[in-house]
Each structure stands twice: as structure tokens, then as C-alpha cells.
Amino acid sequence: MIEAAVFRGLDRRRVLAKGERIEDHVVKAADVALGKAGLEPVDIDRLYGYITVPEYLTPNSLYHVHHLLGLPPEVMVVPINSEYSNFLLGVVHAAEAVEAGRTRNSLVACGANWTGHMDYTKGHAVSIGDAAGAAVVGPSDRFVVVDHLTRTASSQYHGLTMTMRTLHLNGLTLLPTDPVTGLPTPTYDMTQTGIEDLGGLIKDAVPVVALDLLKRNDVDPNQVTLLTHQGSRILMDHWNERIKPREYLDTLAEHGNMTLATYPVNLAYYLDEITTEYTLIVAVACGLHVTALLLRN
């Protein structure tokens, strides 16, 4: 499969300016989420999520977000490295902690700065956009976690990766470096197998996982607003046709593929426009896996 045949539907994307850091945007998103929930940093028990690509291999920059937000030292920081399902898994774990009586309010925050970590000789690179989003998870009668479902194809572990690698252009071999530090920096790669997985395994797995989750909970697709990974209009049109939700909301043309930030950003973007009984969020992720989260609105 040729990349150009897959990555269509993009009009614009957002890119961090020189000197901007994604952590600052994550903090802004978290502040908005706290404000909408009527909470202060002192009301938060745990911070879930992930910042990618982080400043260090470890610790994750989510710890720096903890500092910038002024969260109390008692707040547990839980980085979840599962691109791009980090937000969904954070919501799942946060909700389970609430149900178990271990916490009352958790913050789930994600940020992606991938535009600075792409190989722009590859077709998929121009679809990537930088973004940040956050949500508060606590006792509420809105957007209640109903159920979740995951399918993992770990045999495809090598297909989608972020690591240090040399790039090849016009007969030259280059090692990408960070413009600030001058040190080698990781870049994202989608192998030919990974591209074929998009047009095959992932293309088919998203509707299967989505419909299996709905069936398990006796929910009709017509009761659902759908949010998914947004990297290709062709794939999204296929998922819409197969799942047949009441509404299918995205911001691909406006924001591009925001990787792990896609889900909190789009949920916030359309929050006041969702009128269906349920919201279904389906994440495509490295590893390789597909995760679906069902919320009762």
C-alpha cells in the first residue's frame, strides 16, 4: 500500500513555534478542565496521562506538568506510555480508582509535540499536528464510564515506532538533532508493514472492536456519537460506514492527526454539541492495539 493512498483529508495542522513547549499547553488545557469542573489543584488526587515526545526518556514530562499546575505533593503522577490510547487508558484507570473509593477526583492530561519528531520525506509526516488536552474524572452523572474493550496485535510491535534513527535524503545519511540541545532526537517511523496494517488490520479492527463493545452493552449505534483516531479520511469514512453511529465528529481538516491528544481535544471541542445517549471513543495505537471506551452522556 502507498502512503499517499491513505493519508488524505488534511487541510491544516497546528505546529509549536520555536521556543514553545507542549507542557505549557497541557497546563492551559488542565486549567480549563479544572475550571469547568469547579475544582482547584488541591482537589486532585491523581494525575494520569502522558507527554510525548518527553524531554527525557525518563522521567516523563507529566511530572513537570504536576509542578507547573501547582498540584499538591500528595498527588500521584501516573504516566501511561501507550501512544495513542493514553487518554482513554487514563480515563479508565481514573474511573476505576473512583469506583474503588481510592480517589475522588483525578486529572487526565495529554500533550503531543510530534511535528518536531517526524521524517518529512515520508507521506504520513505532514498529517501530524501538535496539541494538548485534559479532563477531570470524578463523581458525575455526565460522561459516565460504562465499559471499555481492547484488541492487541502484538505481532505488529515493530510497525509503528518512535526512536533514534538515521534518515536518508538525496544520498545523504542524517542523524536528526534537537535544535535547542544539539543532541540526537527521536523520530517516528511507520514501516511498510505498519502502513499495510493501517489499510488492513487497523481498518478492520476499529469497527469490530467498536461494535463488539456496543453489543456487549446492548447499545445501538444510532444511540452513539463516535470519536476516533483521525489520520486518514479514507479510513474514517470506512469506519463511519461500518459502525453507522448517529453522529461522527472529528477535526481532521482543522487540526490534523493530533496522535494521543486527539481524543481529549475533540471531546472538549464538541462537548456542548453531543446530544446522543452515549459517546464512543476508539483509539488506534502503537504496539499494536485498538481500544474503545463507551461513555453514557
Predicted regions and their residues:
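Acidic-glycine-rich active-site phosphate/pyrophosphate-binding loop
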Residues: I2-V6, Y56-G70, V108-A112, V180-T181, ...
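Conserved beta-ketoacyl condensing-enzyme motif
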Residues: G19-Y84, L88, R216-M236
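Conserved beta-strand-centric core segments of catalytic alpha/beta enzyme folds
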Residues: M1, K28, L88-T161, P264-N297
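Glycine/charged-rich beta-loop-alpha catalytic/anionic-binding loops adjacent to active sites
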Residues: R12, I44-Y48, L69-I80, G116-D119, ...
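Hydrophobic pocket-lining "lid/loop/helix" segments that shape and contact the acyl-thioester
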Residues: D24-L34, A125-L252
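N-terminal amphipathic/basic leader segments beginning at the initiator methionine
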Residues: M1-V15
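Claisen-condensing/thiolase-fold acyl-transfer catalytic domains that form or cleave C-C bonds
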Residues: V27, V53-P54, P72-E74, N81-R102, ...
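Generic recognition of short, well-ordered alpha-helical segments
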Residues: N60-Y63, Y120, T262
